[in-house]
């Protein structure tokens, strides 16, 4: 019976590359000369450190641009509120990964409402979709790609015939 998995994964290697490129740009840009500005990656949290709120916004734009170039979807970035003090400004960007319960329910509900003859079941942080025909599974993929209101990027893997 054909099946595939719906996941939301983040390529950690590409994230590291994006942060490294952003750090490189900040060190070479003229408007950041003489400032102690940097990006720091720990697990799935990117910390932006600089001296002013304006520079913090510029750094966030740099990070988003570099992440886009590396193929990381901006939807998986959760930007926290900036912490601005006298001479330092800091902001944390959390990189979300995996399908949480509300999003999984929303996806399963959309699949069931589409009346396509498949079964969808949540397994940890993935959703397994099984059906009798490969065409039905491809129709589900197209349905999910067309959904605009998903706040996480989805990938389809483990396709078995």
Curated annotation (Swiss-Prot):
<comment type="function">
    <text>Nucleotide-binding protein.</text>
</comment>
<dbReference type="InterPro" id="IPR007551">
    <property type="entry name" value="DUF520"/>
</dbReference>
<protein>
    <recommendedName>
        <fullName>Nucleotide-binding protein Tcr_1902</fullName>
    </recommendedName>
</protein>
<dbReference type="GO" id="GO:0005829">
    <property type="term" value="C:cytosol"/>
</dbReference>
<dbReference type="InterPro" id="IPR035571">
    <property type="entry name" value="UPF0234-like_C"/>
</dbReference>
<dbReference type="Pfam" id="PF04461">
    <property type="entry name" value="DUF520"/>
</dbReference>
<comment type="similarity">
    <text>Belongs to the YajQ family.</text>
</comment>
<dbReference type="GO" id="GO:0000166">
    <property type="term" value="F:nucleotide binding"/>
</dbReference>
<keyword id="KW-0547">Nucleotide-binding</keyword>
<dbReference type="InterPro" id="IPR035570">
    <property type="entry name" value="UPF0234_N"/>
</dbReference>
<dbReference type="InterPro" id="IPR036183">
    <property type="entry name" value="YajQ-like_sf"/>
</dbReference>
């Amino acid at each position: 019976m054909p099946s595939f998995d719906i996941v939301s994964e983040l390529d950690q290697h590409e994230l590291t590359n994006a942060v490294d490129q952003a750090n490189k740009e900040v060190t070479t840009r003229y408007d950041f000369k003489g400032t102690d500005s940097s990006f720091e990656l720990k697990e799935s949290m990117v910390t932006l450190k600089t001296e002013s709120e304006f520079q913090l916004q510029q750094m966030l734009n740099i990070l988003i641009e570099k992440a886009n170039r590396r193929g990381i979807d901006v939807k998986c970035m959760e930007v926290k509120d900036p912490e601005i003090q006298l001479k330092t400004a800091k902001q944390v960007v959390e990189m979300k990964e995996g399908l949480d319960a509300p999003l999984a329910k929303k996806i399963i509900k959309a699949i069931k409402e589409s009346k396509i003859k498949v079964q969808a079941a949540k397994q940890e942080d993935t959703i397994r979709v099984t059906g009798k025909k490969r065409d039905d599974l491809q129709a589900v993929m197209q349905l999910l790609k067309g959904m605009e209101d998903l706040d996480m990027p989805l990938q389809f893997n483990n396709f078995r015939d």
